[in-house]
UniProtKB/Swiss-Prot annotation:
Subcellular location: Cytoplasm
Family annotation (SUPFAM superfamilies): Radical SAM enzymes (SSF102114)
Protein name: Lipoyl synthase
NCBIfam families: lipA, PRK05481.1, PRK12928.1
Keyword match Lipid metabolism: no
Cofactors named for this entry: [4Fe-4S] cluster
Family that this chain belongs to: Belongs to the radical SAM superfamily. Lipoyl synthase family.
Originating species: Brucella anthropi (strain ATCC 49188 / DSM 6882 / CCUG 24695 / JCM 21032 / LMG 3331 / NBRC 15819 / NCTC 12168 / Alc 37)
Record's keyword annotation contains 4Fe-4S: yes
Stretches assigned to the Radical SAM core domain: 72-288
PANTHER family listed in its UniProt record: LIPOYL SYNTHASE, LIPOYL SYNTHASE, MITOCHONDRIAL
Binding site for [4Fe-4S] cluster 1: C60, C65, C71, S299
Catalytic activity field: [[Fe-S] cluster scaffold protein carrying a second [4Fe-4S](2+) cluster] + N(6)-octanoyl-L-lysyl-[protein] + 2 oxidized [2Fe-2S]-[ferredoxin] + 2 S-adenosyl-L-methionine + 4 H(+) = [[Fe-S] cluster scaffold protein] + N(6)-[(R)-dihydrolipoyl]-L-lysyl-[protein] + 4 Fe(3+) + 2 hydrogen sulfide + 2 5'-deoxyadenosine + 2 L-methionine + 2 reduced [2Fe-2S]-[ferredoxin]
Length: 321
């Protein structure tokens, strides 16, 4: 069966040589509730042309996002800065690993130009991990934010960052640039980190999110996880509590989909009813917003969700008055 991943990655370079030594894993047949349209619309083509003309990289393509057809049709895209090669090799991720190239000094301007051309009212900026850089790419993030502010002042900006592990002062640089939403994904529960996200540290990520709120309480904080990686339900509920202890506003929960046979296998497909229950529980735990469904991804419907976040915060402030 041809999938969206096949169409997106067709004709591209060979991916994941660092995973070539791993044994093949079984790819489970997807259930009926995980179905997406192939990306063939006119809007999709126009978005692709804008991305190409500005020499930009998107996580939509690099990560093989199943929602690329829907989002690009609406001219929504998540720009991935600092190149297309990551310094880490997470077992779930479709982004290539290796030795990255030097930062492109024109990238901030090119991203801002694309945001203006696409008429975006809300933009999401993410990046590969750049452990090779002294600041993990923090200053580059700040320059991209500044360039967008100058080109389209009304556009709200959401960033999805790496963990800046062992990069002292990096987080402060990014927060001073004042993004509207600071997202850093936990990805999975702590018991799965060694197999799924071995280069990261769970409680460092929790502390990172907490520190954002300490530095600037007006910035919305956000984090997401994938399910179906072998986690237990009670572990997800504990993770929710950990995020709330860090005063995180918004949580996303989506189904893990295995990019290739060399990636971590899908242990099971979580049902839509289970996703709905996670959303309900998350709201009772105090999140301003919870997005939970099989195809939920960090940047999916990000603009609409930002409007909901603002409304929820305003309602919360009014209730306390």
């Amino acid at each position: 069966m041809v999938t969206v991943l096949d169409l997106v990655n067709q004709g591209k370079r060979e991916r994941h040589p660092e995973k070539a030594h791993r044994p093949d894993n079984v790819v489970l047949k997807k259930p009926e509730w995980i179905r997406v349209k192939a990306p063939v619309s006119r809007g999709y083509s126009e978005t692709r042309d804008i991305v190409r003309s500005n020499k930009l990289v998107t996580v939509c393509e690099e990560a093989g996002c199943p929602n690329i057809g829907e989002c690009w049709e609406k001219k929504h895209a998540t720009f991935m800065i600092m190149g297309e090669i990551c310094t880490r090799a997470c077992a779930f991720c479709n982004v290539s690993t290796g030795i990255p190239t030097a930062l492109d000094p024109n990238e901030p301007e090119n991203v801002a130009k694309a945001v203006k051309q696409m008429g975006l009212t809300h933009v999401v900026i993410t990046s590969v991990d750049r452990d090779d850089l002294a600041d993990g790419g923090a200053q580059h993030f700040a320059e991209v934010i500044q360039a967008i502010r100058e080109a389209t002042p009304a556009t709200t900006i959401e960033i999805l960052t790496p963990d800046f592990l062992r990069k002292e002062g990096a987080l402060e640089v990014v927060v001073r640039a004042r993004p509207d939403v600071f997202n850093h994904n936990l990805e999975t529960v702590p018991s799965r980190y060694l197999k799924v996200r071995p280069g990261a540290r769970y409680f460092h990520s929790i502390r990172l999110l907490q520190r954002v709120k300490e530095l600037d309480p007006t910035i919305f904080t956000k984090s997401g996880i994938m399910v179906g990686l072998g986690e237990e339900r009670n572990e997800i509920l504990q993770l929710m509590d950990d995020l709330r202890s860090a005063d995180v506003d918004f949580m996303t929960i989506g189904q893990y989909l295995q990019p290739t046979r060399k990636h971590h296998p899908v242990i099971r497909f979580v049902t839509p009813d289970e996703f709905k229950s996670f959303e309900t529980i998350g709201r009772t735990k105090g999140f301003l917003l919870v997005a939970s469904s099989p195809l939920t991804r960090s940047s999916h419907h990000a603009g609409d969700d930002f409007a909901k976040l603002r409304a929820a915060r305003e309602a919360q402030i009014s209730a306390r008055a």
